[in-house]
Amino acid sequence: MTTHFTKEAFDTFEIEGLEQRMDAIRERIQPVFKQIGQEVSPDLTVNLAEDMYVHIAQHARRKVNPPKDTWMAFSPNKRGYKKHPHFQVGLFDDHLFIWLAYIYELPNKSQYATKLLNHQELLHALPSDFVVSYDHMKKEAQQIDETGLEQGLVRFRDVKKAEFLVGRHVSAEEVSAMSHEDLVKLIRNTYEQLVPIYKKIQ
């Protein structure tokens, strides 16, 4: 069983058909998610002083269109993650994403946005390879210093469907060359940088 994301894992998103692609996700990607979950969730639990549970996306609502990406999440809620600030690891066909995510299902979204607006210095202090996104369904992300961060956070506050995600994107080529140990080290390092934001923005 593979314990890291191979080129084949990223090629999964070229497979036609919902069932065929889901079979490949279960075979090539989800075992790696499980392994990452076992290693990373105890770290987050310690660092956050609250239990963090692993959720692996099952794409159960899909009936026709195959998913363009897939992910796992770490959340303080055993039953779900979408209504809570949470940490994600996932793949599109060309990159890995490692996020702290505030998505549109989050209740009291405007309160989180206001706190982020009041603590933008936490975001500007992140390493230069960190990026932000305002829509988890889109591949694109922007460097934090280039974004008009305030404008994006205002939109996150005021627009119901707007989101805020911050973390790292790593190319498929780079990820597929990594060992399992290097991959987990990268995820841990990314989350270590994001934990202070998670704690502050409650």
Curated annotation (Swiss-Prot):
Q: Which InterPro entries match?
A: UPF0637 (IPR009403), UPF0637_domain_sf (IPR053707)
Q: Name one Pfam family in it.
A: DUF1054
Q: Which SUPFAM superfamilies match?
A: YktB/PF0168-like
Q: Which family does it belong to?
A: Belongs to the UPF0637 family.
Q: Which HAMAP family match?
A: UPF0637
State the protein's name.
UPF0637 protein Exig_2520
